[in-house]
Structure formats: C-alpha cells, structure tokens
C-alpha cells in the first residue's frame, strides 16, 4: 500500500495526489457533475494555448492550496479550459488506476 502511495505522489505532487486518491474511490471533489458530463459529451480536441496556460495555473493552485481555493480556481476557468482540466484529471486517474496493484 505504501508503494502505491509513493507512485501516486510521484504522478501527482502536493495536494493533487490526495484528490486523485479520492477520485480512485469515485469521489471527484474538484468538479460538479455537470462539468464532468460536459467534458465527456464534447468531442476530444487538442488544448488551445490560452487554455493550457489557464489549466497550468489551476494545477499549481490544486497542488498547493486547500480544496475550497482549488474549487474556486476551477470554477473561475473559462469553459473550454475547465473542460480540458476535467479531461486531464480523468487521464491522470486512468494512469493512477494502472499503477494500483490488482485486488482479488
């Protein structure tokens, strides 16, 4: 179990590792259901440069700040940047899931 936690921390620094651990249990505290649904309903597309900058700033906030501050940062993102962040988050969750040991 400790080894899995180390891998998760390496994948996601700071507070993000704790948020991903919650996500692996099905709880996604950064996003409301509508944002998650919108991200999966829209066609996948490359992230625009301005969205990448906004997502990068949001990720720094998520890694460093308490959850309420991180949620406010996510909520303040333009729609396309929020959509990109949700998709990135779920890609990180997929990666974290792959790193988990198999359970029988």
Where are these regions (language model features)?
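Short amphipathic alpha-helical interaction elements located at domain edges
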Residues: 1-104
